């Protein structure tokens, strides 16, 4: 169960232009040299990021003890980021982002979470509906050297799940938004909140879920409504059945990408955005700012994201373009480029090739407004 926390020279240039880092707090070694300079750096950070943190055990969120603890955590993280960026040979950088006063454990519990319990092998097997993989016959040698579904208009803006473990809903919705644009020509921003509130048979709202279960729910429910009709609140509430009955976008089902096969994942992403799971609870992922991520991570999958493209840098490093749900002030304006092709038949970096799936939509059919059945809110 995911608790949470995604060529030619011209294509390379376009990818570089789209990879600008989010705004972060710049600092130098001198900012770490004394208590006074560290306090000044911390206040600069606090003036940028107004975020609410869980109180320390037994304390109050704004008392002196908790404030001191937050400062100490910030200092440790700032020093880690500085030392990591000083090391050579890493094609990515870290930054003091909005998570800079959170311990790794707090970050994991709030934005990542319940790890390997979600694996499909523990939830009824693999293969999606019918066990097929429609892109299996595609010739790998004939795939485009780079794909970016953002540039094809099939990706909505970056969203922010907040302190709610609903990454699975954002991953699901990104994939459905993408295939709907490809099949109908319409990019519609869809409702994660409907999934959080209403898809409660197998998924657990802010306490985690699986993208495959969410695809099943959308099909079974007859579609999914829009973000504007059922806005996101970053908390689980009572299902608004009247709003959820507005089936603005439909799918026919879903399929799973063969596990541990980056070649198969590339074939799928060449055709549509794909829901994927990664391990995102390490410090390098927490503070990622820009570049091709090659940082420390394992395969305890704890975060749902969407693979919305792939490419290659000028120096030949292959990468995935991954849409996250932590807001535009994380990573490359909400995205992360993750190293691709780590090894043949591998799990992929951070397990990205282990649990990928995508929605199936055969044509331009969506529910018409005239056919909507509005039910009483319950």
From Swiss-Prot:
GO terms for molecular function: cysteine-type endopeptidase activity. One of its GO terms (cellular component) is protein storage vacuole. GO terms for biological process: proteolysis involved in protein catabolic process. Its main location: other. It comes from the Eukaryota. It is found in: Protein storage vacuole. SUPFAM superfamilies: Cysteine proteinases. Cysteine endopeptidase that digests in vitro both the acidic and basic subunits of glutelin, the major seed storage protein of rice. This is Cysteine endopeptidase RepA.
């Amino acid at each position: 169960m995911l608790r949470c926390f995604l060529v030619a020279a011209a294509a390379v240039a376009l990818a570089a232009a789209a990879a600008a880092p989010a705004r972060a707090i710049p600092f130098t070694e001198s900012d770490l040299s004394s208590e006074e300079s560290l306090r000044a750096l911390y206040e600069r950070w606090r003036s940028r990021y107004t975020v609410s943190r869980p109180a320390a055990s037994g304390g109050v969120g704004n008392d002196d003890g908790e404030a001191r603890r937050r400062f100490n955590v910030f200092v440790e993280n700032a020093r880690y980021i500085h030392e990591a960026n000083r090391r050579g040979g890493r094609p990515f950088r870290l930054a003091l982002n909005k998570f800079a006063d959170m311990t790794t454990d707090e970050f994991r519990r709030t934005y990542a979470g319940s790890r390997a319990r979600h694996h499909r092998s523990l939830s009824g097997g693999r293969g999606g509906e019918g066990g097929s993989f429609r892109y299996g016959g595609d010739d790998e040698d004939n795939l485009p050297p780079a794909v970016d579904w953002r540039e094809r208009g099939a990706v909505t803006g970056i969203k922010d799940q907040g302190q709610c473990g609903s990454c699975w809903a954002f991953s699901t919705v990104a994939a459905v938004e993408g295939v709907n644009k490809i099949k109908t020509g319409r990019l519609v921003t869809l409702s994660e909140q409907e999934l959080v509130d209403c898809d409660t048979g197998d998924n657990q709202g802010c306490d985690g879920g699986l993208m495959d279960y969410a695809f099943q729910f959308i099909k079974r429910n007859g579609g999914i409504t829009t973000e504007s009709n059922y806005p996101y609140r970053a908390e689980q509430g009572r299902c608004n059945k009247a709003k959820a009955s507005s089936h603005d976008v439909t799918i026919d089902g879903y399929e799973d990408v063969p596990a541990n096969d980056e070649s198969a994942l590339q074939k799928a992403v060449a055709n549509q955005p794909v829901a994927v799971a990664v391990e995102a609870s390490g410090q390098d992922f927490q503070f990622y700012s820009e570049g091709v991520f090659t940082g420390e991570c394992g395969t305890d999958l704890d975060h749902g994201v969407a693979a919305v493209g792939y490419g290659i840098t000028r120096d030949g490093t292959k990468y995935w373009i991954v849409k996250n749900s932590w807001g535009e002030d994380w990573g490359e304006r909400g995205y992360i480029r993750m190293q691709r092709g780590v090894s043949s038949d591998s799990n992929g970096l951070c397990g990205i090739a282990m649990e990928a799936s995508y929605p199936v939509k055969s044509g331009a059919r969506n529910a018409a407004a005239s056919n909507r059945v509005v039910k009483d809110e319950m």
